[in-house]
């Protein structure tokens, strides 16, 4: 703050240090660029993917959250909802966005195959632990299957690691699962709790589509339009750099993961003891306790007339939820 102020709009020492720290920690990140938020990073990655592949369509997992931009407001929270949550967004904004059912590789391949005849698939976006930070969990086999299909059909694999980055491990979920995305979205922790927490990292052959000037060969190429007044501001970059340093020094990811395992084990014992119709699971420190309607597996979105009766069962669970609360208080 004493040497360059809170925001200069110019390159500075801690922008470099933070980028290098992320690149050193995450193997697939040859190059990194700060953005103003995870939402902006997701927008930028879509533009990179379309420039790099010359394809149009983006496929995301149904229910996943990749920010609140017009295009990504499709199929959020619950798989199959499509545009129904995107109030205020014209339907033509969703012309080149699709959702695929989590854990269903056949559904994804069907869309990839059909897209070959309607503009191609530029990228497949996924939260590597499942939509909404793993609220709908997915299998390791599915994650690796998505990577395989992206390679087969020439689409970029985009990992949204806003939640999982530097939390599941220093290498994020991709290091945990042993998968190599082409682009990675970062957020939250990379600014140490300060504003401007967003970033895109990835392979050099794709990251070259950001910024100005020529690519490494000297050939002029079209670049993705990105920006932001507070992007890469010195305060946030400095906070982010020292936060990541401290996470690594203290082995915080592993310790937090062990705590997540412990709390979920305890919750599972309570659920079993009281015979509650609840579900508990975790990936490291990302813990879930599901008690309500979105986990009604018998819901069939193709038969909407059956849904009210199924959701009515949630009311029956009120007593069990009271028991759960009492168990917490005991």
Go through each PLM region and give its residues:
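Conserved N-terminal phosphate-binding loop of PLP-dependent enzymes in the Aspartate aminotransferase
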Residues: 1-330
């Amino acid at each position: 703050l004493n040497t360059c102020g809170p925001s200069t709009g110019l390159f500075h020492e801690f922008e470099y240090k933070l980028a290098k720290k992320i690149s050193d920690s995450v193997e697939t990140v040859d190059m990194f660029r700060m953005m103003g938020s995870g939402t902006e990073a997701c927008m930028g990655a879509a533009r990179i993917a379309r420039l790099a592949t010359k394809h149009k369509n983006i496929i995301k997992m149904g229910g996943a959250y990749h920010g609140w931009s017009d295009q990504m407001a499709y199929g959020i929270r619950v798989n199959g909802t499509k545009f129904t949550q995107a109030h205020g967004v014209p339907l033509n904004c969703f012309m080149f966005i699709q959702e695929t059912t989590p854990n269903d590789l056949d559904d994804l391949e069907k869309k990839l195959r059909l897209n070959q005849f309607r503009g191609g698939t530029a990228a497949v976006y996924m939260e590597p632990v499942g939509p909404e930070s793993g609220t709908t969990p997915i299998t390791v086999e599915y994650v690796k299957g998505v990577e395989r299909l992206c390679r087969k059909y020439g689409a970029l694999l985009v990992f949204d690691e806003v939640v999982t980055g530097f939390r599941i491990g220093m290498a994020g979920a991709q290091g945990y699962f042993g998968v190599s995305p082409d682009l990675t979205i970062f957020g939250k922790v990379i600014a140490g709790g300060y504003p401007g927490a967003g970033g895109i990292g990835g392979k050099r052959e794709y990251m070259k589509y950001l910024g100005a000037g020529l690519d490494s060969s000297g050939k002029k190429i079209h670049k993705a339009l990105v920006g932001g007044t507070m992007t890469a501001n010195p305060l946030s970059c400095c906070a982010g750099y020292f936060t990541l340093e401290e996470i690594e020094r203290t082995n915080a990811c592993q310790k937090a993961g062990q705590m997540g395992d412990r709390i979920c084990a305890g919750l599972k014992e309570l659920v079993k003891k009281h015979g509650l119709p609840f579900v508990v699971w975790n990936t490291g420190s990302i813990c879930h306790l599901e008690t309500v309607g979105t986990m009604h597996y018998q819901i069939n979105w193709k038969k909407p007339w059956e849904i009210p009766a199924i959701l009515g069962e949630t009311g029956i669970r009120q007593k069990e939820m009271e028991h759960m609360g009492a168990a917490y208080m005991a």
